[in-house]
From Swiss-Prot:
Named cofactor requirement(s): FMN
Protein name (record): FMN-dependent NADH:quinone oxidoreductase
Source organism of this protein record: Sodalis glossinidius (strain morsitans)
Keyword Ubl conjugation: no
Family annotation (Gene3D superfamilies): 3.40.50.360
């Protein structure tokens, strides 16, 4: 039995191209893995706060008294990290917005990147503290960017996830969705077929 965490990051609600892919993954996984638990976190519907000068102080080891906002941020960070660590398969939607990931997903990453919790530094360099996970990235793009210099999303996600210890990372792309209705449907269908292959593997 596996535990699966699905993190949605689109801000477009019913107009999203990535949410249908996440929903398709959930349906396919439940169909083929009847006893597995799936947790869904929708950052578009329930965003996490952006770190500022006050909140970032709550995430660093310190004996200082925390403000109410800091305490809330620390508790949320603990909950998000606990959720991440409790699951075996991690699925992130990552639509490309202006060549980058959504700010809501970046805010989430900022809350789970905790020194001495998800990574730590030693004399040998950074040590990864998130173990035995595999991740799937569902990334949608208006244009065609895969394997080009404009695909900053793939590089960033591999770098960030690898830094905390998630090195088994697969990507499924739906590209050219702004090239017209037929192109969007084709991109969705191809991505859903790739999801089916991932789920069945």
């Amino acid at each position: 039995m596996s535990k699966v965490l699905v993190v949605k990051s689109s801000i477009l609600a019913t107009f999203s191209q990535s949410n249908p892919l996440a929903d398709h993954f959930i349906d396919q996984w439940r169909e083929q893995h009847l006893n597995d638990d799936i947790t869904v976190r929708d950052l578009g519907a329930q965003p996490v706060p952006e770190l500022d000068g006050e909140l970032v102080g709550a995430l660093r080891p310190s004996d200082a008294t925390l403000t109410q906002r800091q305490q809330q941020a620390l508790e949320l960070s603990d909950a998000l990290i606990g959720e991440l660590q409790a699951n075996d398969v991690l699925v992130f939607t990552a639509p490309m917005y202006n060549f980058a990931i959504p700010s809501k997903l970046k805010n989430y990453f900022d809350l789970i990147a905790r020194a001495s919790v998800t990574f730590r530094y030693s004399e040998q360099g950074p040590e990864r503290l998130v173990k035995n996970k595999r991740a799937l990235i569902l990334t949608t793009r208006d244009g065609i960017h895969k394997d080009t210099s404009s695909d900053l999303v793939t590089h960033y996600l591999r770098l960030f996830l690898g830094f905390i210890g998630i090195t088994d990372v697969s990507f499924i792309y739906a590209e050219g969705v702004a090239y017209g209705p037929e192109a969007a449907v084709k991109a969705q269908e191809e991505a859903k077929a790739s999801i089916q292959s991932f789920v069945s593997a």
